Amino acid sequence: MNTQIIAIANQKGGVGKTTTCANLGIGLAQAGKKVLLIDSDPQGSLTISLGNPQPDKLPFTLSDAMGRILMDEPLKPGEGILHHPEGVDLMPADIQLSGMEVSLVNAMSRETILRQYLNTLKGQYSHILIDCQPSLGMLTVNALAAANRVIIPVQSEYLPAKGLEQLLSTVSKVKRQINPKLQIDGILLTMVDNRTNFAKEIAALLRETYGSKIKVFGTEIPHSVRAKEISAEGKSIFAHDPNGKVAEGYKNLTQEVIKLEKQREKSRAGLSR
């Protein structure tokens, strides 16, 4: 099985990374894909949003898995992976992960510890989605070193130019030095309030500024109070409000991501002839 590893990254917090990771993951599962979600944020937002309100009480989290790799200790198959009723698996995170980030600074092959862990799981999943922490620290670098694709959620309420440039520069550095397979799938506009001209202007400006170099997804995720309610419920927007506009947005994004994969496969097949 050719596993697609997608990092959901933006060093700014509050842009919809966790929501996108959970709902795109569950959207892919509904489309028949075998999906693992990785929470690589010590705050454990993805872990909490998928029904684990106390990540610190979980017996095994990502920091334990990465610790085993660091210490060259064996991992049992699927150890610590939780199953969510909507058809995805989850490797949870807790605050111990911030200690792991400190340990990585002096470790050998420090940028590839997460990649080495994911290599033990690759054949079991068609898709692995990584929810990155809101920083460009060692955990995010590990996620980018492990991924072959990046999706960048951007909130449509402000112009993200400076932060976006930093992220793009980090992605190109990781691609150049560590992971030549890394590609940007696109920029995803989130929390879009189409009632305001400002949101439309930001969207137009993003497409104008980056559209020639980087795809800006045709799908935009609308702003919704209902979407904000679900993080306490432990379920996706598809289970919470299946006919709402946010569920429709994530359904469309899922189709766009699958279409992109098919296009890439086609062009790879064409090149290899």
Q: Can you say where each PLM-predicted feature lies in the sequence?
A:
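P-loop NTP-binding core
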Residues: 1-273
